[in-house]
Amino acid sequence: MKRSIIAGVGAYLPSTVVSNDELAKRVDTSDAWIRERTGIEQRYLATADESCAFMAARAAERALAHAGMTADDVDAILVATSTPDQVFPAVAVRVQALLGAKRGFGFDLSAACSGFVYGLSMGDALIRSGQAKGVLVIGAEVFSRLLDWDDRRTNVLFGDGAGAAFLRASTDNDDPARGILSTHLHSEGEFGDILFIDGANGVAGHPGTIVMNGREVFRHAVGKMAQAVEEAMAANDLTPADIDWLVPHQANLRIIEAMGKKLDLPPEKVVVTVNRHANTSAASIPLALNEAVQDGRIQPGSVVLMEALGGGLTWGSAILRM
């Protein structure tokens, strides 16, 4: 059976960096208040010229270059985002045009902060089914355009950016143990009102801003993500000792640390970027993955575990061997 191999990764972060101290000049907060509650020190915010599609395309170009591939090798483009530039066409087809890709197809998927894990699952399914040989999975967000700048419960948490992974079908020359081992997706709609955007493009004059019950999100996050991680390990007969790296959704340092402890993983096995990137929603996992690959922490053969929870509620996990 064909497996999906992550052949390349890439990322794009906006040109504007905003520290906590700079943010405190705009809203009623402080560096100490933000760090204590979230672990965030700064975030990247998109300029007017840095659209969701632009950032997604830049990340995709870098992932293709890292994989030694070109736009001609792309059969499908999947973009996980909650902040598309327009209702339609999809960000994915805008990316297709920006890359100069002439074949295949693209679509967006909306699973909030779980989006990249959902995208990996869809991309993996396309490759396993034989419908595609090369798939770009991208997480891209411009949450700064949906923030209520008077609500410090949310406006200190989020940042903008994009991360991408190029999946290719395995060949006879590949190590049969390499690739995406399994993905596990969940949702529970009854909790949709604890994290949402209170509007939509279809609501005249009200595109919406983020609304969040932080305590409830925290309460669900650790338990549900741990369940998804344990499910992934059990499906592959693995234990925490077999995991080389945990690449979690970068929402809050306290949640990340709690996840590591719950899984008995030492801090040095957990990739953390939330301090510099803040919460970039669907972009957070691929941004963190890219950093750990590029700096040499994640090597070929590394067993990598990903997990995320987002509005919906949606949550899930993916486990793979690089």
Curated annotation (Swiss-Prot):
Disulfide bonds listed in the record: none
A GO-annotated cellular component: cytoplasm
Pathway listed: Lipid metabolism; fatty acid biosynthesis
Active site: 113, 249, 279
Entry's localization field: Cytoplasm
Keywords, in A-Z order: Acyltransferase, Cytoplasm, Fatty acid biosynthesis, Fatty acid metabolism, Lipid biosynthesis, Lipid metabolism, Multifunctional enzyme, Transferase
InterPro entries: ACP_syn_III_C (IPR013747), ACP_syn_III_N (IPR013751), FabH (IPR004655), Thiolase-like (IPR016039)
CDD domains associated with the record: KAS_III (cd00830)
Coiled coil, from the record: none
Major subcellular location class: cytoplasm
Catalysis: reaction(s): malonyl-[ACP] + acetyl-CoA + H(+) = 3-oxobutanoyl-[ACP] + CO2 + CoA
Pfam families: ACP_syn_III, ACP_syn_III_C
Free-text domain note: The last Arg residue of the ACP-binding site is essential for the weak association between ACP/AcpP and FabH.
Xref: HAMAP family: FabH
Oligomer status and interactors: Homodimer.
Function, in words: Catalyzes the condensation reaction of fatty acid synthesis by the addition to an acyl acceptor of two carbons from malonyl-ACP. Catalyzes the first condensation reaction which initiates fatty acid synthesis and may therefore play a role in governing the total rate of fatty acid production. Possesses both acetoacetyl-ACP synthase and acetyl transacylase activities. Its substrate specificity determines the biosynthesis of branched-chain and/or straight-chain of fatty acids.
Designated name of the protein: Beta-ketoacyl-[acyl-carrier-protein] synthase III
Organism phylogeny: Bacteria, Pseudomonadati, Pseudomonadota, Alphaproteobacteria, Acetobacterales
